[in-house]
């Protein structure tokens, strides 16, 4: 059954899985994924010579409930629903999780800008340089300085809360080019070394650096103390604790890592805590290697500037390492990124929730994916998944133009009825 697809050359892992399945007469294959976009576009009848039929989930797709302690798209964006349907067009509300970066390029609103510290368009020979730094400053933008200092503050707060032995990580993902990543590593190292030198000075409590730490703490974290059930230390608590700011700055300086194909750096949180009486405090710089397969324990601060002309839903989701379980420090997590990236993720969050809702409806009707039409919301600035995976998909546009729609169900909720009446009155 099924016809051969001569234009399809499956990837190695897909090929090997299918060849293993072909060995057995009775078999079960269950896929578990957070990005199901590519799976639903697999053709259910196309096959290849060596592998046979592809891995379309013909029997069922189950939407697993999101645990209450998981910080995912829906929670971060506070996705709004009305009677189960996602509210499509609304402004992204002020959310202290996001810090919009505008100083990474000379013209932050120009997607084709190639000037500045880390502009949207740069190549492997790019030298990151912030145009407006003072003569004695490290050439990184203020947003990255603040992000690094925020990481030091959140680490101090977590130590105060009793999570001393837990790993604490910051992610810096700004370029896909390994040579550029190593320059960023040098700049970040120089900046943290400067912080350490100032913190170790005898009069450090009167230094501008400590004043800046205090300002960031109150502006970005302590101001939200009434919105969390976790203990929120005062500024003095952070200074007086055994594992204080001064201690953390020193640890961070020793543990800045580059994770890419040219680096020998590794992450070993367990071994570190076994050799010390506290967890690893580390800043991790990288690119594509960080998108999957590497656990960033205790990730609280992410600085993410990757850009593409037409990014893919699933690739962006894999890069979004800030999604996950953040027990005891969910209120301290922050993402520094551009407003474009925020809009991309908001759209993906709406598209994902709509797809999950479709899976729930399909299951409630007892239908299978073979019987049920599955669709994913598109965006003119994004691609759902790779063109190879979408070769059997087709694009459709829905419109109510020249259509007569008959309403056969009515809302009972009094508030909804009054709202509809006011809207049409």
Region roles according to the model:
Residues 116-119, 124-161, 167, 175-178, ...:
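C-terminal catalytic or substrate-handling cores of phosphate/nucleotide-
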Residues 23, 258-343:
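Conserved RecA-like P-loop NTPase helicase motor core
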Residues 35-39, 68-71, 176-179, 290-291, ...:
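Conserved nucleotide-binding/hydrolysis micro-motifs of P-loop NTPases
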Residues 2-157, 169, 204-212:
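Conserved P-loop NTPase catalytic core
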Residues 1-6, 134-139, 143, 157-283, ...:
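Conserved C-terminal RecA-like helicase domain
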Residues 53-62, 189-197, 300-329, 356-360:
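C-terminal, active-site-flanking charged/polar segments
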């Amino acid at each position: 059954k099924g016809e051969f697809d001569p234009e399809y050359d499956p990837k190695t892992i897909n090929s090997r899985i299918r060849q293993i399945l072909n060995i057995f007469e009775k078999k079960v294959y269950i896929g578990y994924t957070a990005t199901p976009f590519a799976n639903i576009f697999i053709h259910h009848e196309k096959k290849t010579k060596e592998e046979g039929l592809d891995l379309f989930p013909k029997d069922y797709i189950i939407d697993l409930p999101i645990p209450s302690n998981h910080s995912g798209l829906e929670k971060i964006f506070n996705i709004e629903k009305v009677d189960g349907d996602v509210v499509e067009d609304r402004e992204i509300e002020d959310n202290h999780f996001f810090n919009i970066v505008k100083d990474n390029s000379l013209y932050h609103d120009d997607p084709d800008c190639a000037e500045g510290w880390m502009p949207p368009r740069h190549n492997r020979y790019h030298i990151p340089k912030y145009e407006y730094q003072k003569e004695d400053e490290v050439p990184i933008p203020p947003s990255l300085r603040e992000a690094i200092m925020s990481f030091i503050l959140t680490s101090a707060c977590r130590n105060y809360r009793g999570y001393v032995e837990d790993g604490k990580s910051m992610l810096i993902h700004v370029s896909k080019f390994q040579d550029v990543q190593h320059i960023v590593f040098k700049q970040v190292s120089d900046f943290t070394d400067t912080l350490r030198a100032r913190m170790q000075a005898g009069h450090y409590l009167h230094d501008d650096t400590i004043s800046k730490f205090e300002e960031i703490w109150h502006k970005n974290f302590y101001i939200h103390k009434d919105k969390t059930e976790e203990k929120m230390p005062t500024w003095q608590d952070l200074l007086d604790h055994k594992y204080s700011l001064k201690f953390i700055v020193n640890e961070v300086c020793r543990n800045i890592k580059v994770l890419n194909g040219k680096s020998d750096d590794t992450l070993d949180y367990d071994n570190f805590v076994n050799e010390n009486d506290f967890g690893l405090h580390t800043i991790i710089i990288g690119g594509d290697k960080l998108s999957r397969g590497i656990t960033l324990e205790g990730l609280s601060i992410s600085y993410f500037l990757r850009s593409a002309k037409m990014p893919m839903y699933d690739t962006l989701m894999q890069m979004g390492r800030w999604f996950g379980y953040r027990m005891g420090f969910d209120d301290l997590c922050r993402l520094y990124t551009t407003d474009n990236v925020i809009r991309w993720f908001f759209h993906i969050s709406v598209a994902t929730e709509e797809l999950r809702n479709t899976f729930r409806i399909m299951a409630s009707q007892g239908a299978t994916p073979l019987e049920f039409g599955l669709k994913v919301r598109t965006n003119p600035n994004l691609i759902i998944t790779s063109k190879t995976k979408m070769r059997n998909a087709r694009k459709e546009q829905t419109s109510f133009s020249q259509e007569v729609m008959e309403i056969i169900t009515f809302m009972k909720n009094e508030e909804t009825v009054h709202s509809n009446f006011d809207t049409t009155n």
